A protein has these predicted regions:
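Aromatic-lined glycan-binding groove of carbohydrate-active enzymes
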Residues: 74-95, 130-132
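C-terminal domain-boundary segment and adjacent tail
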Residues: 30, 101-137
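A general structural detector for well-ordered alpha-helical segments in enzyme core domains, enriched
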Residues: 19, 71-75, 120
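Catalytic domains of cell-wall/extracellular-matrix polysaccharide-remodeling enzymes
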Residues: 1-52, 63-64
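Active-site glycine- and acidic-residue-rich loops that bind
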Residues: 9-14, 57-78, 111
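Conserved, mostly hydrophobic/aromatic
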Residues: 5, 87, 124
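Substrate-binding/catalytic groove segments of enzymes
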Residues: 98
């Protein structure tokens, strides 16, 4: 059973209804998008409710000038006391299918570098930011 179930890449009301219904039927933790928000235009206070916890979403990987380090600094400048702040990443390997079909080629590799950068870990530790898994939400 997956830790969570979501589909932020597609923006269709019917799609989100179907995703939520499927998650309910199969007892999966569902994470949609904040009402009235699109995946590429989330406002800084956009959140979803996951098991009674406000989850504030940050995803800028589809923006032309995307820089995960800059996104992290935005998140750190706007931390929320009433929930958790979550950056959404798409790191991973690049295979033939992804190379031919994905619009996230550069962001994928940039996110791998960012997520494995010891300076990022040190910055979060310095600020006493606790990293949690989605299972904990």
């Amino acid at each position: 059973k997956p830790d969570y179930f979501e589909g932020h890449a597609v923006t269709s009301t019917n799609y989100f209804k179907a995703m939520e219904q499927f998650a309910t039927e199969h007892e999966l933790k569902y994470s949609g998008l904040p009402q009235g928000q699109g995946p590429n235009s989330l406002t800084e206070d956009a959140f979803i409710d996951v098991n009674g916890t406000k989850v504030y979403l940050y995803m800028e990987s589809m923006q032309a000038d995307y820089d995960p380090y800059r996104t992290l600094e935005k998140l750190l400048a706007n931390l929320h006391d009433d929930g958790v702040d979550m950056m959404i990443f798409h790191p991973g390997y690049l295979d033939d299918y992804i190379l031919k079909n994905s619009s996230l080629l550069i962001p994928r590799t940039a996110e791998v570098a960012f997520l494995t950068d010891p300076a990022v870990k040190a910055r979060l530790e310095q600020l006493k930011i606790e990293l949690i898994s989605y299972k904990e939400v």
